[in-house]
Amino acid sequence: MGISRDHWHKRRATGGKRAPIRKKRKYELGRPAANTKLGPQRIHLVRSRGGNTKYRALRLDTGNFSWGSECSTRKSRIIDVVYNASNNELVRTKTLVKNAIVVVDATPFRQWYESHYLLPLGRKKGAKLTEAEDAIINKKRSQKTAKKYLARQRLSKVESALEEQFHTGRLLACVASRPGQCGRADGYILEGKELEFYLRKIKSKRAK
């Protein structure tokens, strides 16, 4: 039997059975879930109603993540799935779905921050910079350019919880796209109250 999105197979509110009024129709069809896993990218194309195409992601390992407070978006590697409000099984099997909480690589965001503000981020005190990083941060600049960066640095504050994550090189993010429909796992970096909430949830889950 095919997956059907009809409602006449359900019982009445009184508990009585309904007689089937017709056979299944094409416009009532449903498809099996994509259950997108972490791994080298694999996307299938699915023809849908009206000749449109859906991008069924079966495996993904990267996504575009937005750092809201800095208005910056970077492509980053997805490392792990750590929390899912709807189902713990989806965490165990590392399934990427909308609103899954994932761990992403912090490097692209750190590189952007350091080149934008010319300030180190998420580094131990006294840690040596590589030649390339040193060339970006300590490069000799004109007076006008230096003034521009000084003005930026006044607004360069990063909240402590996020800075701690930069020290570990991993950031918590939330998937905002639907990988089984659009073939992408894009989302945003968790900040503020939302970050606090999910850190609490993850901590209590580990304590069990």
UniProtKB/Swiss-Prot annotation:
Compositional bias of kind Basic residues: 7-26
Keywords: Cytoplasm, Lipoprotein, Membrane, Nucleus, Ribonucleoprotein, Ribosomal protein
One cellular component (GO) term of this entry: cytoplasm
Keyword Nucleus in record: yes
Keyword Glycoprotein listed: no
Membrane topology annotation: Lipid-anchor
Example GO molecular function: structural constituent of ribosome
InterPro entries assigned: Ribosomal_eS8, Ribosomal_eS8_CS, Ribosomal_protein_eS8_euk, Ribosomal_Se8/biogenesis_NSA2
GO terms (BP aspect): ribosomal small subunit biogenesis; translation
Subcellular location: Cytoplasm; Membrane; Nucleus, Nucleolus
Positions of the UniProt region annotated as Disordered: 1-34
Main location: cytoplasm
PANTHER family in UniProt: 40S RIBOSOMAL PROTEIN S8 (PTHR10394)
Described function: Component of the small ribosomal subunit. The ribosome is a large ribonucleoprotein complex responsible for the synthesis of proteins in the cell. Part of the small subunit (SSU) processome, first precursor of the small eukaryotic ribosomal subunit. During the assembly of the SSU processome in the nucleolus, many ribosome biogenesis factors, an RNA chaperone and ribosomal proteins associate with the nascent pre-rRNA and work in concert to generate RNA folding, modifications, rearrangements and cleavage as well as targeted degradation of pre-ribosomal RNA by the RNA exosome.
Quaternary assembly: Component of the small ribosomal subunit. Identified in a IGF2BP1-dependent mRNP granule complex containing untranslated mRNAs. Part of the small subunit (SSU) processome, composed of more than 70 proteins and the RNA chaperone small nucleolar RNA (snoRNA) U3.
Family note: Belongs to the eukaryotic ribosomal protein eS8 family.
NCBIfam families: eS8
Protein name: Small ribosomal subunit protein eS8
Organism of origin: Spodoptera frugiperda
Taxonomic classification: Eukaryota, Metazoa, Ecdysozoa, Arthropoda, Hexapoda
Gene name for this UniProt entry: RpS8
